Amino acid sequence: MDEGTLEAAITAYSAQLQQVESALLAGLDPSQQADLLKLKEDLSQLIELTEASLVSVKKSRLLATLEEDDGLQSLATGTPANGGLDNEFAAFYSEVGEVSGSSSDMREREDEREEEDDGEVEGEVDALSGTKVRAPYRTSWGTLEYHNAMIVGTESCDRNEAQVRVLYVHPTQKSMKPCPFFLEDKCRFADNCRFSHGEVVYVSELREFLESDLTNLQEGSSCLARQDDGIWYSGKITDIDNDFYTVKFDSALLKNVMVEADGVIPPLREDDLPSCSDSEDDDNGEGEAAFPRVLTQEEDWAPSRSSSAFGGWEAHTRGIGSKLMLKMGYEYGKGLGKTSEGRVEPVLAVVLPKGKSLDQCAELTARKTQRKVAKGKDGQQVSRNKRTRKARAHNTGGCHNVFDFLNRKLGNGDANPEAGGTCGPPPSHTPSSQGAGVEAYKGGKSTKRNLNVKLFQAAERVAQTEREIQRLTESLSRRTGRDSSMVTHLEEKLSAARSLLVQQKAQELSAQRENRKADTHKKMTEF
């Protein structure tokens, strides 16, 4: 930039600064006043940077003028301009013993020229301060990324190449976030600071600043959104309402946020990668030739025999596989293989036992198959046996006299059926279940004690569940109207506790009936 442009910029910035100062004197709202104070500070810094750039340009112009004057003066005095005569004079002075003084003068002149060249380079680099660029950033895992940044200063030249220090505008990691105390020279941690003190990069590595275009953002678009910690995280836009964007972050640890337009940008990293859309739009067809193609005629392709859509499982993933295949020339909807008649379903994954050989895995698979077949046959046999028993019970009929009834109730299962009647115990009851039922009905001491313990445990469970229901009810009343998710969770737990209470009360009633039944039998049998 020339002097005129810089002076005009300084004049414009000064006028804007005066307008801001007059607006501050007018007495506005505290919120507006804070914004104006921030704007005033930014304008002051911008004026200082522009003035520094103007001084650098003036220095460069003056140095160039001085060099021209030195050249004209040397021509006027007859001093040779080429280096050959200087060498001859140096040889002559060496012969007469004055070579030391002349060589020192030559070295001084060369040092002065180098200092002037370095000053010009530093002046050009200083003029870049405050410029927005795209700078490289090397992550801890070794990848190279380009992010929007701003030049904040210069560094010592390395390998005859200028270096600058940049601060990233949209930090995506804590190590990229500018240290709030670095610009004020108040940071006490130096290189051990967890925040960024600027990244030193070569000037040749800088790229043009990429402005964020919010017009392409819509619901479902990927984006970068700023969190309260000042770091920009990747996510997707779920809703747009009057320049307010609702963003769902990719990380499950971050909650959905609603940000304004200055808190969301498109994912700028994707533009760094070579896009295949540019090659597809090429009129010369070079993009299509860049990918290997197998089919050249439409009739060579036949529809796939499978009814499932290719890549249907990627509805649950990010779909990186299909994207890579499309970049390699795959045409969507066609099968794999030379004639595009291959499979489109994924190969099912079979998890084999750990530490087993393939022979053992095959044997285990065969055993599972045999068990399934045998289980099916056993099920058919069991159902056939059930039908046979039901038919036999229907043909024999039930008990016909009062003696069979008394024998069955009082536990005389070993009595001869022919002595007391034609019917024994029903075939559906096993002897063990009959003995337990008769023992419970007779009300023996051990059985009575077990019934009492069972009744006590049932009562304790009911009391504990009632206390839990009371606690959940109190907690729900306290949280009503605060946290909807917690209220829903408490309501679910309360409903489950009430269902459990109904079951436990039913068990308690059953235990009470058994206990009363044993007491009744004891009273009827003891005279």
From Swiss-Prot:
Segments of skewed composition (Acidic residues): 111-125
Keyword Aminoacyl-tRNA synthetase tagged: no
Chain intervals annotated as zinc finger (C3H1-type): 173-200
A Pfam family reported for this protein in Swiss-Prot or TrEMBL: zf-CCCH_4
InterPro entries (UniProt xref): G_patch_dom, Znf-CCCH_4, Znf_CCCH
Function: Transcription repressor that specifically binds the 5'-GGAG[GA]A[GA]A-3' consensus sequence. Represses transcription by recruiting the chromatin multiprotein complex NuRD to target promoters. Negatively regulates expression of EGFR, a gene involved in cell proliferation, survival and migration.
Protein name: Zinc finger CCCH-type with G patch domain-containing protein
This protein's encoding gene: zgpat
